Amino acid sequence: MEIKHKKNRSLYIPYAGPVLLEFPLLNKGSAFSMEERSNFNLLGLLPEVVETIEEQAERAWRQFEDFKTDIDKHIYLRNIQDTNETLFYRLLENHLEVMMPIIYTPTVGSACERFSEIYRRARGVFISWPNRHNMDDILQNVPIHNIKVIVVTDGERILGLGDQGIGGMGIPIGKLSLYTACGGISPAYTLPIVLDVGTNNQQLLNDPLYMGWRHPRITDDEYYAFVDDFIQAVKQRWPNVLLQFEDFAQKNAMPLLERYRDEICCFNDDIQGTAAVTLGTLIAASRAAGSQLSEQKIVFLGAGSAGCGIAEQIIAWMRTEGGLSDEQARARVFMVDRFGLLTDNMPNLLSFQSKLVQKRDSLKGWDTQSDSISLLDVVRNAKPDILIGVSGQTGLFTEEIIREMHKHCARPIVMPLSNPTSRVEATPHDILNWTDGAALVATGSPFQPVTVKEKTYPIAQCNNAYIFPGIGLGIISSGALRVTDEMMMAASEALASHSPLVNTGSGLVLPPLTDIQQVSKDIAFAVGKMAQQQGVAVKTSAEALLQAIEENFWLPEYRSYRRTSI
């Protein structure tokens, strides 16, 4: 079946009766007209009143408000999504700022941990190791022929929560909800997938309700052969699809990206998406301060694939914006992990970490307490302007470290990006109080505004949802065949151009979520234009690209149905 979304055109539907009501992509519930009820054998299967989508959304909102806990609200919204997707997205559109933290971080973390417990209905595709020889058949079982975006995880590193096994499916479902709500990509074009290669989470293995394959994780050559087979099956079924890798473990995330980025249109959101939104935030913050990012010194706490991905994107921008050499740019970036500052004499570094070391000889003048150079040592000696946390460990940005940074930096930029909120390196409340309100703070999860000395500071959420929906829309609209680093930087710059702090001199460094659909369209244009310039998409006029973006932007509105046969 192929569902085409052309605005204001009727849809020809081969389903009727209870089958139609059970199809979330097509179900309108009480909004089916009397004519449609007659034509599709729905008479008597629905209450008498024909409602508008806004009337349905108002009822759903009131029901949503009755739930007391975030996880119950999440379950309720997922039930609507699995019943009537158009209503689900209209509800999100009406209340995005309230509902985004419910459908995604931080609440989605709890939903992943409790996936088997709260499971109601299948969504997406589950490919398990025991079924590895049936991948082609499994993907053929998906009834939608024109899938355009896949988000896939193996559940091994879910947010900051670690191995959640099959429970990691909550992440692709949540991410794709944002592709639609923020980026206008039709839900009919999206597919969440989990690769179930077992779990090393003993709690899950012992849980009688756990729905995944009960076996320790498959690793090494067998694991990579499994993913190879998956990629080939996807290419055969949907050769032009955009594939997003999500929440793979550090040891696999970068190797998988490097292995497939020239074979299929793909990117890793934890590495490249996080890097793009962080870079966009830093570009805007630097411009608001009247400086360039290439003039700043930056310290990272966390040298995994996400932290190193952000660092590499920043270094590339420094070369582009400030004309720095690669060596000059790398000298301004300091990576700290649990063993201390990464230096060129450290053993057992991963390949992507070894490119980001500081030369030990250049640190001879530093005042340090031991051979292992701590985060405090780095802050005291390097005197950074920017501190970024991607460690997944709470409380590591201590009062001493933040105050030390503020001694030499009047307006420090502090970004504790770890998710969920329980893993944040420091809270905005503490950071702003330790700096007397001077710090510019952006976080990975949502936080309430903070009041310091009778002044209230809104907290920017450095959320990947500002970036990946627009990237997806741009790739679909331009027909891009690959995702390049330059396309990611174009997305960052487009995001920075929407900063209220830059454009008005006040407010947040990132735009409000109420603007996110327009932000996504502008990012899509920048990404599509760069794809054309780099030869990974067919060149068109700017007007044609803009038109394609508008035509591809799906809106949660009911359309009239006409009956047809399969």
Swiss-Prot record:
Reported cofactor(s): Mg(2+); Mn(2+)
InterPro entries per UniProt: Aminoacid_DH-like_N_sf, Malic_enzyme_CS, Malic_N_dom, Malic_N_dom_sf, Malic_NAD-bd, Malic_OxRdtase, NAD(P)-bd_dom_sf, NAD_malic_enz_proteobac
The EC number(s) this enzyme carries: 1.1.1.38
Signal peptide feature range: none
GO cellular component: cytosol
Residues holding a divalent metal cation: E246, D247, D270
Chain positions recorded as NAD(+) binding sites: R157, D270, N419
SUPFAM superfamilies to which the protein is assigned, alphabetical: Aminoacid dehydrogenase-like, N-terminal domain, NAD(P)-binding Rossmann-fold domains
Superkingdom in the source lineage: Bacteria
Pfam family membership, one: Malic_M
Biological process (GO), any one: malate metabolic process
Keywords: Metal-binding, NAD, Oxidoreductase
Site keyed Important for activity: positions: D270
Active site: Y104 (proton donor), K175 (proton acceptor)
Recorded catalytic activity of this chain's protein: (S)-malate + NAD(+) = pyruvate + CO2 + NADH; oxaloacetate + H(+) = pyruvate + CO2
Complex and partners: Homotetramer.
Family: Belongs to the malic enzymes family.
Protein name: NAD-dependent malic enzyme
Organism of provenance: Cronobacter sakazakii (strain ATCC BAA-894)
